[in-house]
From Swiss-Prot:
Protein name: Reticulocalbin-3
GO cellular component: endoplasmic reticulum; endoplasmic reticulum lumen
Sequence motif Prevents secretion from ER, location on chain: 325-328
Positions bound to Ca(2+) 1: 92, 94, 96, 101
BP GO annotations: collagen biosynthetic process; ERAD pathway; lung epithelium development; phospholipid homeostasis; positive regulation of peptidase activity; protein secretion; protein transport; regulation of phosphatidylinositol 3-kinase/protein kinase B signal transduction
Glycosylation sites: 140
Residues binding Ca(2+) 3, per UniProt: 176, 178, 180, 182, 187
Gene3D superfamilies tied to this protein: EF-hand
Signal peptide: 1-20
Amino acid sequence: MMWRWSFLLLLLLLRHWALGKPSPDAGPHGQDRVHHGTPLSEAPHDDAHGNFQYDHEAFLGRDVAKEFDKLSPEESQARLGRIVDRMDLAGDSDGWVSLAELRAWIAHTQQRHIRDSVSAAWHTYDTDRDGRVGWEELRNATYGHYEPGEEFHDVEDAETYKKMLARDERRFRVADQDGDSMATREELTAFLHPEEFPHMRDIVVAETLEDLDKNKDGYVQVEEYIADLYSEEPGEEEPAWVQTERQQFREFRDLNKDGRLDGSEVGYWVLPPSQDQPLVEANHLLHESDTDKDGRLSKAEILSNWNMFVGSQATNYGEDLTRHHDEL
């Protein structure tokens, strides 16, 4: 879910400039209300049918993968060659790309969108340019400036906004590990992307429960789970995918089979035990490209299997490519 942050940050800022307040229908700072760990790609992993989009986005990142799709095959391969050189240079510079170097590159790509979103937020929230983001700065930049006791006196549904503000402050206090009410860049990252930090796990679970537990009994019932995904229209037959979600709830979400999700089950759902996704993808790319089976990749091996690593398009590839590729 946090892969949407850069776009959502832009929406939040536009909304703030136009209306002065974030939407009460969104989570903190425009994020989706239910947190999930950051995937390498939302595309299906379907190599068997020649669909390498998942691999492209895992290796390059979604935005850069789209740019490669606009390139000629020759330019795409040339830029891939420069990436290969950079991967090896970041490692031991022995002329080969090891599994560790490939994993490190994919992990770097996975974190790029987080770094970009935090940089944008930092510029917005650090209003006094002192190199830290105070809670007051963040609050005022997000909700507007109010005198104590007058919060949201000028808006409809003031109570909803007060709850949002309290929730943001609670998350900020957890992210602010030294308790000085001033966020470092690392602490602001934890605030904006709590699913990436172990010490933020409890707040992620608490926020998810608050959003889904409509009857406030401390659990997520199956109907509450479904209601977050689907709004039934009168007389409408429930779609097959909703029925599949009900089955998913019963078989995989409700671990103790009591018909509801408690806090630990919510945590297992939204932040499951960590799998090293970059390592899994690195092993996959190595297995598919290591033709001499020596456990490492030469530049030639990567380029010979270039269409698994990056995409291309033979026509109209240069006209709307505006981003500079210095980092590649």
